[in-house]
Regions:
Chain A
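Glycine-rich phosphate-binding loops of nucleotide-dependent enzymes
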Residues: 1-232
Length: 232, 387, 288
């Protein structure tokens, strides 16, 4: 369970997130939806400590507030960041190995084997530079790299950005599968129909505040939703 | 203090002074001699010993009752200013001396960078100036600069005697020249090349390297396999040491070195690995001299300065003899203030001091020098008769 | 003739290996922290003096070189803590500060140590023959040591955990942070590592060339040419460029004119920037 209380993020005078509170229950997928600049990425980055924030962040009973990013990773939080942030001039294998940077070598090796068996394309491309992969493959490497640290909570920023519809379906399948393993997942997604297809709950953000929250059908049906997206 | 008592005191002091000078035999005057030089900064290694030499000469002259002009005895008093090894500070120092109307002769500065502004200001103000730095050669003898002198030999003067001695001493037949690409080198290469030919030595190649070069290996390779037996290696200690060191490293290169500089320091560490190194001592060799006059001067120097003789000490002889010559020139001219008359007497005078020296009609020094030699692991010097 | 070309080539790679070591530190710091550290040459100079004084005091060259390397590592860490940490994220401030540091360090060194050049006794002297080739003993030793350090450093970057973290960080700072790399600590350590390499290069310089307070300037300028030539931030680029510059200077001085020695590097740089505007290995391809 990931609990966020009164979280605020500001860059200088510009307040990106304004005191939001929400929770992601164990083994569920929650999606933060909203237009560009609504505060989705800032919220995810605040949870992993990439940006400084005020408020309280608790993951599985452990307070993350004030910890460095590496310590949050140690406590089981992993993030697939905006733009995937792969290491383009390192091989797929090296990228995945670095995902286990904080783990013991033996554990790391074992997890790598499991992931490669599960996603044979990773094994095929193991020695290729990550930068040479297609967008979908890169997204898969990014997610698997995050899984290498054996997280309890996985944050994914824009899993579908720039991907073809056929690939989006594949990503959806992977997320569903992860959901099935009991992983707690928080995604930030602009594509509302994709978010509605994978998530148990949606949280609609607008200008750093929560405008609506509930099951996908509840949120999509609300007038705030159309207003937040279309500005009408 | 009341006016009366003040006047009384002045009168008393004057009486005492007059009585004191009367005791010297005649009424004594004081000649103020200006000194400008780098007493601080990187060039102080040259100019501090040069001042010490002047002070020695002055102490010796004054101790013997001064020098006489027209039967009157004069004492010398040095007025010194620090050029700080910088041209702007040197110009200020020169101005200070020029503002003292009692100073008619100035000596000093052995390095060209601070030296040039001093010499040009002195020449412009028509004040007699005896300098030591190399660039002074371009100032001495120019129309209007009749009062400018240089107390050290020009390159041409030294080279004439130096080259034949070196060729004989090292047994050279074919040499290469490796010097920095600058004006000083270009000038002296022009002077030395024909002298080597006259001495029967072939100069088979001349290479100019970029000033500041530290790695000489590639350019030294050009000198390999040319049948050379000697290298002429410029005028700066760091370059010379680097070239000697790297010649030994690279191998298949001559091990005899001719150096236009004033010190044996570049070769000292490699004395037992090379076949010979010669350099120019523009005054006298103080390290291994057998000349009685030099030995006696060394004792006087040690007593006067409480210092030991080091590599730079021989620069103390730059102006030492010139101070005595100046006294004689003033006597001959019968004046301590008419600079043109004094300068005229100085030119052409031959003086057998610690150095045997003279000034030619332009004001260039023509003096005997010593040639320093490291050969067979031994360091010694031989005199070069220039005069 | 062929022999001569080989000899000249060997001279070139020997000094080239030293150039590469200095360029490595510059490119690493730039790649990771985005600071062009102009004070880098001062680590070369101070390292040379540390080695010189230890050798003059009767210690072996090896002791001198190791102490110089470690001392400059500490010096780099101190500089980072005292100065560069405060200019992070402001490249112009970093540049201005490092230029100021050059002035301060050089002038303090000149005042304290005198500007006189000093020559250190090398651990080996003379030369030796390999078939028809005549090789300088000390230059060969320097080449072996610097190549070993460069190779060792490359292996460290390729295979060690910290090395991988450094490479990862240069490719994506955020990505590295998210896998648990402490990016601040790594940034700091890279100053120490770069400076230590420069210190080692300084000790090696001292075994061949004169030690003076101003000796850092030439390796620094060359290091920057190389870092730019190799593509700023690229380790293989900086290494390749180092050897290339050594060869260019060596062949230029040998077969063209020695009075233009330092010009050859700039000619290569200008041509490279005109025709390969992103460095020897192309845009962002061959980072750390």
């Amino acid at each position: 369970m990931l609990e966020i209380e009164n979280l605020s993020v500001s860059y200088g005078r510009n307040e990106a997130v304004r005191g939001i509170s929400f929770a992601v229950p164990d083994a569920s997928i929650v999606a933060l939806v909203g237009a560009n600049g609504a505060g989705k990425t800032s919220t995810l980055n605040a949870i992993t400590g990439l940006v400084s924030s005020s408020g309280r962040i608790v993951s599985n009973g452990r307070v993350l507030t004030g910890l460095t990013t590496d310590n949050r990773v140690r406590l089981g939080v992993a993030q697939v960041a905006e733009g995937r942030q792969l290491f383009p001039l390192m091989s797929v294998r090296e990228n995945l190995e670095l995902g286990g940077y904080l783990c013991r070598a033996a554990e790391s090796r074992q997890r790598l084997t499991v992931l490669m068996e599960r996603f044979p394309v990773l094994a095929e491309r193991a020695d290729q530079f990550a930068g040479t992969l297609s967008g979908g493959e890169q997204q898969m490497v990014a997610i698997c790299r995050a899984l290498m640290s054996a997280p309890q909570v996985l944050l994914i920023d824009e899993p579908c950005l720039g991907l073809a519809p056929i690939i989006i379906r594949k990503v959806t399948a992977i997320l569903r599968e992860l959901h099935g393993t009991g992983l707690t997942i928080l995604i930030a997604e602009q594509n509302a129909s994709f978010a509605a297809a994978v998530a148990d709950r949606l949280i609609l953000l607008e200008n750093g505040r929560i405008r609506a929250e509930g099951s996908p059908n509840e949120v999509l049906g609300q007038p705030q939703f159309r207003q937040a997206y279309l500005g009408v | 203090m009341s006016g009366m008592r003040w006047k009384g005191l002045v009168a008393g002091v004057l009486t005492f002074a007059l009585a004191g000078s009367a005791a010297l035999g005649q009424t004594a005057g004081v000649v103020k001699l200006g000194y400008v030089g780098s007493l601080t900064g990187p060039h102080s290694g040259w100019d501090v010993p040069a001042l010490e030499g002047m002070q020695m000469a002055v102490t010796e002259i004054n101790g013997a009752g001064g020098f006489k002009v027209g039967g009157k005895a004069y004492r010398i008093e040095i007025v010194q200013e620090d050029a700080q090894s910088k041209p702007d500070a040197a110009a200020t120092a020169a101005q200070k001396l020029l503002s003292d109307e009692d100073i008619h002769v100035v000596m000093g500065v052995l390095t060209s960078v601070p030296g040039v502004p001093v010499a040009t200001q002195m020449a412009k103000a028509k004040v007699m100036y005896i300098g030591g730095f190399t660039a002074m050669d371009g100032i001495v003898g120019k129309p209007g600069n009749e009062l400018s002198f240089r107390a050290l030999d020009t390159d041409d003067t030294v080279a004439k005697g130096f080259v034949p001695v070196v060729v004989k001493e090292l047994g050279l037949k074919k040499v290469g020249i490796l010097v920095p690409n600058d004006d000083v080198s270009k000038t002296f290469v022009k002077a030395y090349q024909p002298l080597f030919s006259q001495a029967g030595v072939e100069v088979s190649m001349v290479e100019f390297f970029q000033p500041g070069t530290t790695d000489f290996a590639p350019v030294l390779r050009k000198f390999q396999g040319k049948g050379l037996d000697g290298m002429f290696i410029g005028y700066a200690d760091p370059d010379a040491e680097a070239i000697i060191r790297q010649s030994l490293e690279v191998g298949d290169l001559p091990k005899k070195f001719v150096y236009r500089g004033g010190s044996g320091a570049p070769a000292v560490k490699y004395a037992d690995k090379i076949d010979g190194f010669v350099w120019q001592i523009l005054t006298r060799d103080l390290a291994s001299s057998s000349d009685e006059k030099v030995k006696a001067w060394i004792d006087r120097y040690k007593a006067a300065t409480k210092k030991d003789i080091v590599a730079n000490t021989y620069w103390a002889l730059t102006f030492y003899d010139a101070v005595f010559m100046l006294g004689k020139a003033m006597d001959a001219a019968g004046t301590t203030t008419d600079q043109a008359a004094i300068a005229a007497k100085l030119k052409g005078m031959v003086y057998d001091g610690v150095r045997r020296m003279s000034f030619d009609k332009d004001g260039h020094a023509v003096t005997d020098v010593d040639i320093g030699i490291i050969k067979g692991g031994k360091t010694y010097s031989i005199p070069e008769k220039v005069l | 003739m062929l022999l001569d070309i080989i000899q000249t080539g060997l001279d070139g790679v020997m000094v080239g290996s030293l150039y590469a070591m200095v360029a490595l530190g510059i490119t690493l710091v730039f790649g990771l922290v985005g600071i062009l550290n102009f004070a880098h040459g001062q680590s070369v100079m101070l390292g040379a003096y540390v080695c010189f004084f230890l050798v003059s005091a009767g210690h072996s060259f090896w002791v001198g070189a190791i102490v110089a390397t470690l001392a400059m590592g500490v010096f780099g860490a101190l500089l980072e803590r005292a100065v560069f940490r405060r200019t992070l994220g402001d490249p112009f401030a970093g540049l201005a500060v490092s230029l100021g540091l050059i002035m301060i360090i050089e002038n303090v060194a000149a005042a304290a140590l005198t500007p006189d050049p000093r020559f250190m006794d090398a651990p080996v002297s003379g030369n030796f023959a390999v078939g028809p080739l005549l090789l300088s003993s000390q230059r060969s030793l320097v080449f072996v040591i610097s190549s070993a350090l460069i190779l060792g450093f490359w292996l460290f970057l390729q295979y060690s955990t910290l090395g991988k973290a450094i490479r990862a960080m240069s490719q994506s700072r955020q990505g590295a942070a998210l896998v648990g790399v402490r990016v601040d600590t790594v940034s700091r350590s890279i100053f120490a590592v770069g400076s230590a390499l420069a210190g080692a290069a300084g000790a090696l310089y001292a075994s061949l060339f004169a030690v003076t307070p101003f000796m850092g300037a030439a390796p620094l300028t060359k290091g920057f040419i190389l870092a730019a030539l190799g593509g700023l931030g690229s380790v293989p680029g900086a290494i390749a460029a180092g050897f290339l510059l050594g060869l260019a200077e060596s062949f230029g001085s040998r077969y063209l004119s020695a009075s233009f020695r330092d010009g050859y590097g700039f000619i290569i740089l200008i041509f490279a920037l005109l025709f390969l505007p992103t460095g020897l290995f192309g845009a962002g391809k061959a980072r750390v």
